[in-house]
């Protein structure tokens, strides 16, 4: 997701709108990409956990594992192949190069973003009107608990500098997540 290609933050679910606004904050995109590349994090799932944290909801490792189980088929069949294709087209084969290859890559990027949006909308529907998890004492406590639950589900710890950037951006946001 890049700020120049993102749709209007006024469309979609509250979770999608939160994601667009949050991702546009300074250093957030780089931190998300670092976590994706270094630790295999599903950025959409991480954003979902941070969105819940913004509403002071802490999810358990079992909650996160169930979310992962439900979203993995879509991610693996659509989002990851589109991302792989988009990245490969940064250095296209010589048969189709230059502006035509870049135009095609831009179209793939738009489809990738739409696949991510569809995943996020489905995740929002999974939560339903009642949010997942349990009430936490603070936004930061919920965020740390949700990230820890995700890391535990993945079998390890996430790179701390990237996590701290995301937590600082979330805690310092100063607005409700649905705004």
State each model region's role.
Residues 66-81, 148-154:
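Short, mixed-charge aromatic SLiMs
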Residues 28-72:
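N-terminal interaction modules that seed assembly of large macromolecular complexes
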Residues 59-65, 83-96:
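Short acidic alpha-helical/loop segments enriched in Asp/Glu that coordinate divalent cations
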Residues 40-44, 52-57, 75, 113-116, ...:
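Short alpha-helix boundary/capping elements
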Residues 1-25, 80-83, 87-91:
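An acidic intrinsically disordered interaction segment
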Residues 88-169:
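A charged, amphipathic interaction segment
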Residues 31, 41-47, 78-81, 100, ...:
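Residue-level detector of well-ordered alpha-helical segments, enriched
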Residues 2, 16-20, 24-26, 156, ...:
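Acidic, glycine/proline-rich low-complexity segments that act as flexible tails and inter-domain linkers
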